[in-house]
């Protein structure tokens, strides 16, 4: 099975004209998901406003990143057979409690931005998967991140890897496989800030937030989390008062400082948290929602909170939560 990477004319034009506007991480620079440029197209499709297309072997739901005229992406291939196809639409019953029994290969690929030609490909791990996946998930769902000199690749229940832009492995850090809700697998992407890489693993066994040195892969600190399986990528909130690591969770949304100290927390999210928070107009927006839940809230926070700032059942705001849509 292969997937197709399509490059929009608007993205190619953006990176050609403004090198500072590479797409270095999940949802772009600072995780805001915003590409503000006059070259952006309103319409695109398989044959419209596309510069090139490239068949990619295997399966991977990670987003490509763009840096220095290169496109970096991850994918996982298998020695034989095809992964079970994900059915379209909303449905239940996609859980798979046992992993495949054939050898898989966890890969990172680099393509030329202007042409889509493969520049290099590297296999970072191979073996039989130790954990299952929902048929809508993949073994390569975490988006890489780059600081412009190195690329950091995470496969959630295999390991984290640092490579140079030409594909040379600098370090690797093995990560233990963990049981996730109904065997759905992992998806939270790594986050880079200054000299540290932040990795989160919310699972049904031993959840944690981990900071590692980006140059060596050595652990800087680790905090245990009273959480079960979540899939939300952490968000680095650089507000007017301080820099925080925001981690959405089913039990609590938590904020940590850059040394792993808990700053504040609040409850009220739905039973599944996936969405990345974002900042706009000086406020932080945190959301969660699941089709099976009656509550699908959206919170707006202002900087400076401490302690437990959870809303009471009859509240939609307090000193630090500016407003909440409980729907």
Where are these regions (language model features)?
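Bacterial N-terminal signal peptides
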Residues: 5-15
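N-terminal secretory signal peptides that target proteins for export/translocation
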Residues: 1-2
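Noncatalytic, solvent-exposed loop/strand surfaces
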Residues: 16-327
